[in-house]
Amino acid sequence: MKRILAFVLVVVFVFALSGCGAKEAKKDIFNLVEKNYDAIVTACENKDSEALLAINGIKEVDIVDGYVLIYCKGAGIAPSSQDYGFYYSEENLPVGVFDGQIVCSNSELVDYENGYRYLDSGYNEFYTEHIKGNIYFYSTAF
């Protein structure tokens, strides 16, 4: 029993030090966008997923209906997982994003903290916040 407790405490400690939290992920993504803003905007305007994937910190790119959806990181195992990234909106409108798809429109979002939130009927939460220009941060909890 003591070994199991010690193992659990070590795992919790390692995750605490690794910056796996939502605030750290958000800060990292805001910094990534700020540092690479011109390259990101140019690549998004040209729908150049290869140029985006060449930027350190970008893992996946999906282009859907005037949006370039960019996945950066995730944590956890469903049903307690979170994904983080950002997206470029041609019309500069926020939306809900999940798994490379748009899950809700601008009109379905409600004001929340510094951005907007959408809760679906399955208790999944989608949050988005303006970063700069036509670029928005997103997080998804599912």
Task: Describe each region flagged by the PLM.
Residues 3, 18-25, 136:
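A contiguous, well-structured "functional interface" segment within a domain
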Residues 20-78:
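N-terminal export/targeting and maturation segments
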